[in-house]
């Protein structure tokens, strides 16, 4: 029942991710002309706490490092396939690139745990024990990314709020757009994404009648360098962008938290 509900939310979230939101929470005016609420104050849902990944699909591509050349669901173009088929983990290790599969386009797919906190009133922080990575989601308007691209890039976030009117319970989601990325891998077996990639994410939380809480993350990767661009008028799974869904269950505390370094294999 839970898995079916997650799939239904997944389908709905993909549609929302690709379309304009019905109602987007802007940093609006505060009560009685006061300052606008911070992102933390405006939050329609609470994402903070510890979450463990649920590997309910693609087990052999997520729990294990797939063999070279195995990327059946990823719409690579010819250059992307060439690079993926030439993957050599020893070269990544020698170059100090063990973390290429731990960038923003793939880190949430790796098995492990998340710890979500507020870095400050307008910045949401996500730490992963797998690869010991940190992501920062900036809700307040920011300057264009400066400096060198990074594994986690620069992530702009906004609340998308639903309900709260006419007796409908208030809820919502987080939409995140990440740019300014270093090249990385969409899978641990060297399936590439480029510095031109843009990662769109949609975070949805749901609560079951028994109290269990789940986090569903929709990820869309748009990469004109390595993902296949469809000919005009053609639609199909063989072309980008690349969309996938990842689920987590909330856990009580940090008892299972196990920070581990990046691995190229």
Give the predicted meaning of each segment.
Residues 2-6, 10, 20-265:
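PEST-like low-complexity, intrinsically disordered acidic/proline/serine-rich tracts
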